[in-house]
Amino acid sequence: MGILSKVEDRPTPPSVYNWRVYACGAVAGSAAIMIGYDSAFIGTTLALPSFKDEFHFEKLGTKAVNLLNANIVSCYQAGAFFGALFAYIAAFFLGRSKGLAIFSAIFVVGAAMMLGANGDRGLGLIYGGRVLAGIGVGGCSNLAPIYISEISPPAIRGRLVCMFELGWQIGGLVGFWINVGLLPQS
């Protein structure tokens, strides 16, 4: 028995194990890339000198800066909590794939809001974008593994669900290393 061999409890036609199953699993698993990326980049972003300069953190005291940082991170977690709750409703009434599409769109809107934030506009866009991104991430982290496990044949179900975790870790790596590249060179 090899590492990629299939173990079946009942015979399944070979036509079931086609590229479509793997492609659907990979696409649904790619939802985890946004989860890993958004979770990873914020810590190093808050520490970047360019971020602190843009939002005038130097004018604030240490306690105020710590409070702002905690609020920026917490908004995302609060959104993820409610996104995970709303995911059940979306999955029940709309289905898993439509729910994934909706929560991914919510994430994109949140990311666009954060992209539009600058020192002149203040942190409001970042707070709102973090909440929406959290809702999208919470919904996708709930729906993607369920969707993948439902579409995959039993013999390769674990392999396909691992695509979700792989996407999460790839997103985390990208999120951390992009900010390392943005650090000022000394």
Where are these regions (language model features)?
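Transmembrane-helix signature of 12-pass secondary carriers
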Residues: 1-186
